Amino acid sequence: MPSRQLQILIRKTLPLVPDHVLIIGESGIAFSKATNLLGQEFEHILFDGRNGIHLEALAIAAGTLKMGGTLCLVLSDWENLSQQPDQDSLRWNGNQSAIATPNFIYHFKQCIERYHFPILREESAVEFPTVFYSNEHHKNATLAQQQIIENILQAEQDIYFLTAKRGRGKSALLGMLANQIQAPVYLTAPNKSAVHSVIEFSEGDIEFIAPDELALTLQTEPEFSQSAWLLVDEAAMIPLPLLQEYSRYFQHIVFSTTIHSYEGTGRGFELKFKRKIHRTFQHFELKQPLRWQENDPLEHFIDDLLLLNAEDDFQHFDYSNITYNIEENAKNLSFPCLRGKVPEGPKGDLDIASLPQALEALLTSKGSEGKYNRQFFFRDFYGLMTIAHYRTSPLDLRRLLDGKNQRFYFAEYQQNLLGAIWALEEGNMADDELIIQIQQGKRRPKGNLVPQALCFHENLSQACKLRSLRISRIAVQPNWQQKGIGQNLMQAMENADVDFLSVSFGYTDELAKFWQKCGFVLVHLGEHQEASSGCYSAIALKGISKEGLALVDTAYKQFQRNLPLSFHPFAINFEQNQLDWQLDDFDWMSLKNFANFHRTLFSSIPAMRRLLKLAGKENFPLISAYLTKKQFPINKKKGVECLRLEIKQYLERGTL
């Protein structure tokens, strides 16, 4: 049986293709809808990459291609591809317009060359031969699948982890397992359309429940989980708090997840999950591909292109009590193309520097001796990020390679990357009118996540004008954690020519204590829990310059002043000094922006409560009723409009 193939076709227009060829892109399945293709198989696929390469969709296409099939990637140019604006950059770069992505294109072309895939110029050269492969022989369990099923059915452990790369028969195993369990079986997954293989192999004798609905049902009808089994497909894509909730009710659970996939679900998920849930575990992994041949060139190409093996290839280094120096150079340079070597540094030193600056040194180094091949150093950096953040995804890879306004700091000791920080430059906005519109909620331009949040939610417009560095990711080798590496990396950042440092994170007590230990103060808690983590978003700041220190001090005092008067669930977790009921300039700004523009109700509640305290509830019957019941008699949108009008009418009267 022939291997699956990738062909690159260089054309300004899409070629005409037979009906049995699936088109992904402008004239077919939208890139954003590609996840709905998971679990299906297609003979041939035409991928429209003329305006940019959507990496996740490309990986999905490769994962759904049948054995012997052809994936044709259409590009508008080849020789000048690195100079063309990539429309996909609008998803991951903060700019308002598309940018060229020379570093990714260099990496992409290297991978194409490595696997000798053809570059075609004529439409007639593309071939979509009939594929005679059938997966009927995989309807029965393989030996590896049957052994895992038998082990799970013995039910000697509480929780089972099943991992596999795509195309290994993981979904089929879940379905066949459900057939043999002599108890009720429930299935949940983040995407119902992707589990039809599980349902097919279970012969329909399994009930699917969406993750949120399952959690709600467990809270209202906990008895339904008694004696039942739960199968969780693509578990790493479901927030950990929900998985923890499931584990409190079901005696036996099988958590299944794809490793080395477009979703960015690394092996770190299992380790992180085990630290959260204290139950007995057993892990199984399917390794033999079933839907294509061993050593399939297309699979290897996707693995290399998306650096899917970077996590496994990362070299862990045992901790030793070394004496090291800290060097900091945060000159912001563009990420060079990946070639060359890193010059040798002083033996035994721990070097912390801006990654682009360090990689710039690779280009200018005249010596041939070096401790790192740059391609491998880049893989190490990405691998370390994947270990620490199991949802590191192809989107992050694209941003890492070509994103603008980035700075990278790393700790390295004798050819081993110990820790790293990935930071983004923010602020330094000069358009006063735009800043006013951000504060009013009229505009939300791309980028500047923390400055815009502080401006809109906390009325701190100065945050947009000052220069700041936001820590996007921080990672330290597992063996070197709790050794001060992370704090030392952040100390090096303090030499940057900015006014303050910031970080946005999913709030947990553990993370809050870590950032506090690093000198940051909490200044914002989001209204809603993040879907990805189940945590409330939080913002913490650390002042650097005189202006930055003043901003952080104001932000912290406002946060401490307003949180006790908010309805945030965490308000009771923080020390509450004497409540401040006096209306200040920030409060009046909040009220005006709520009444006349788009300030949120949640952010305005402290100011509204102070207004009612001083002006009397009789002037605000609607607001008083809402603050008492914390709900609207009508739908929320109309209810908020009524509250805005009540505040607006009062402000227009100009009386207190």
Swiss-Prot record:
Listed SUPFAM superfamilies: Acyl-CoA N-acyltransferases (Nat) (SSF55729), P-loop containing nucleoside triphosphate hydrolases (SSF52540)
Broad class of enzyme this protein falls into: transferase
SS bond list: none
Binding residues for ATP: Q145, G167, R168, G169, K170, S171, A172, L173, L174, G175, M176, R291
Catalytic activity: cytidine(34) in elongator tRNA(Met) + acetyl-CoA + ATP + H2O = N(4)-acetylcytidine(34) in elongator tRNA(Met) + ADP + phosphate + CoA + H(+)
Annotated signal sequence range: none
Annotated keywords: Acyltransferase, ATP-binding, Cytoplasm, Nucleotide-binding, RNA-binding, Transferase, tRNA processing, tRNA-binding
PROSITE patterns xrefs: GNAT
Transmembrane helix found in the keyword field: no
Assigned EC number: 2.3.1.193
Pfam families named among the record's database cross-references: GNAT_acetyltr_2, NAT10_TcmA_helicase, tRNA_bind_3
Chief place of localization: cytoplasm
Domain N-acetyltransferase intervals: 368-542
Residues at which acetyl-CoA binds: I474, A475, V476, Q481, Q482, K483, G484, I485, G486, Q487, E510
Family: Belongs to the RNA cytidine acetyltransferase family. TmcA subfamily.
PANTHER family xrefs: N-ACETYLTRANSFERASE 10 (PTHR10925), RNA CYTIDINE ACETYLTRANSFERASE (PTHR10925:SF5)
UniProt-recorded name of the protein: tRNA(Met) cytidine acetyltransferase TmcA
Source organism of this protein record: Haemophilus influenzae (strain ATCC 51907 / DSM 11121 / KW20 / Rd)
Gene: tmcA
